[in-house]
């Protein structure tokens, strides 16, 4: 029987720690191949990062990626507000719907 390929728990914990340190989000949802157990050698870790309040999305995203440098894993961060999650939770063409449906909450305040 073949084992499912998922993200290393220690790496995921470090990624979450670094994101929380920079962004102080309300919630982080892991989704994509890491949740499905289909990670390959070129897979990244997909994270929906939910943060409310006023902030410059581009600057905060950049700060998150800078802080993830050297973590040893490719990471794709999608930064959204709680209002966007509610507004687009049923929209098929956005990543929010599959992240909520199939993802795993890995951090919550």
Predicted features, each with a name:
Residues 43-45:
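Short, conserved active-site loops that position catalytic residues or coordinate cofactors/metal ions
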